[in-house]
């Protein structure tokens, strides 16, 4: 069995939540505050994790959880191409929230950026974007979800971020996992104010004009009046990373292809 297979005895969100059920849940949760959504998740969902690249929204969720004594484990995908400031922030987060277990996953075939370039070529994100996303995000996330038996994950996505996130529900199925977006209704201003008011550590790049921070090669500061994610993949049609593409993320597509292959081999 490969590291990304899903044994029959593991819970899968898609077997527990049907579309009609999710529609009803979304209607109920849409009236709740983020904190109450987090409480509902604690009462309702086993094997609950947070996945975050340590953007402002993810940090808000982590702080809210900590204040409610909900030490939900964090999954951090090290793409090997993060800014140094992002990796510095990870260490600050560990210090600020010592009771939160942190699981770091990275590409299975390279330990650092230099090894990655040697194995897959320079600037793979330009020559084969889909393969790059798979190697540094999709496969590590798939492995994390399998290793940790993840049923549901908190994400920091918000409708105000625009693009594919404009119609984001509170909860949604993505392959075998349930994704919960407790800050879906919040604006950038609300998120930023929470960070400052509650003294939550944040990425120092935000002091240099950045608002949404991803890999160093695909992130730029935003200009006055631009959407907060305008600095991501500037000049390209892409607006979403490989983990959250709509209607089905590359992670979900990958798991579906894997299942199809297993069935054919039987």
Swiss-Prot record:
GO BP term, pick one: sulfate assimilation, phosphoadenylyl sulfate reduction by phosphoadenylyl-sulfate reductase (thioredoxin)
Chain segments carrying region Disordered: 219-246
Predominant place of localization: cytoplasm
Reactions catalysed according to its record: [thioredoxin]-disulfide + sulfite + adenosine 3',5'-bisphosphate + 2 H(+) = [thioredoxin]-dithiol + 3'-phosphoadenylyl sulfate
InterPro entries, per the entry: PAPS/APS_Rdtase, PAPS_reduct_dom, PAPS_reductase_CysH, Rossmann-like_a/b/a_fold
A GO molecular-function descriptor: phosphoadenylyl-sulfate reductase (thioredoxin) activity
Annotated Gene Ontology cellular component terms: cytosol; nucleus
CDD domains with a match to the protein in the record: PAPS_reductase (cd23945)
Keyword Oxidoreductase: yes
Pathway(s) annotated for this protein in UniProt: Sulfur metabolism; hydrogen sulfide biosynthesis; sulfite from sulfate: step 3/3
Biased composition (Basic and acidic residues): 223-243
Keywords assigned by UniProt, alphabetized: Amino-acid biosynthesis, Cysteine biosynthesis, Cytoplasm, Methionine biosynthesis, NADP, Nucleus, Oxidoreductase
EC annotation from Swiss-Prot or TrEMBL: 1.8.4.8
Subcellular location: Cytoplasm; Nucleus
Phenotype of gene-disrupted mutants: Leads to methionine auxotrophy.
SUPFAM superfamilies: Adenine nucleotide alpha hydrolases-like (SSF52402)
Protein family: Belongs to the PAPS reductase family. CysH subfamily.
Protein's job: The NADP dependent reduction of PAPS into sulfite involves thioredoxin which probably plays the role of a thiol carrier. Required for methionine synthesis.
NCBIfam families linked: cysH (TIGR00434), PAPS_reductase (TIGR02057), PRK02090.1 (NF002537)
Protein name: Probable phosphoadenosine phosphosulfate reductase
Organism annotation: Schizosaccharomyces pombe (strain 972 / ATCC 24843)
Encoding gene per record: met16
């Amino acid at each position: 069995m490969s590291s990304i297979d899903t044994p029959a005895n593991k819970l899968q969100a898609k077997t527990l939540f049907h579309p009609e059920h999710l529609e009803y849940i979304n209607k109920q949760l849409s009236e709740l505050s983020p904190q109450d959504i987090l409480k509902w998740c604690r009462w309702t969902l086993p094997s609950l994790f947070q996945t975050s690249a340590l953007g402002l929204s993810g940090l808000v969720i982590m702080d809210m959880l900590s204040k409610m004594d909900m030490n939900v484990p964090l999954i951090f995908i090290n793409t090997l191409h993060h800014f140094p400031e992002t990796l510095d922030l990870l260490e600050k987060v560990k210090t600020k929230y010592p009771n939160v277990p942190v699981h770091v996953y990275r590409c299975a075939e390279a330990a650092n950026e230099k090894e990655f370039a040697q194995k897959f070529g320079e600037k793979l994100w330009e020559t084969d974007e889909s393969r790059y996303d798979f190697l540094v995000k999709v496969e590590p996330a798939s492995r994390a979800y399998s290793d940790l038996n993840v049923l549901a994950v908190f994400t920091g996505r918000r409708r105000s971020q625009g693009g594919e996130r404009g119609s984001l529900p509170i909860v949604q199925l993505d392959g075998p996992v349930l994704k919960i977006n407790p800050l879906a209704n919040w604006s950038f201003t609300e998120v930023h104010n929470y960070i400052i008011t509650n003294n939550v550590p944040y990425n120092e790049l935000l002091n240099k004009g950045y608002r949404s921070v991803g890999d160093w090669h695909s992130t730029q500061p935003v200009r006055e009046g631009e959407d907060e994610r305008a600095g991501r993949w500037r000049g390209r049609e892409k607006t979403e990373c490989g983990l959250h593409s709509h209607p089905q993320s590359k992670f979900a597509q990958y798991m579906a292809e894997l299942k199809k292959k297993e069935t054919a081999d039987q």
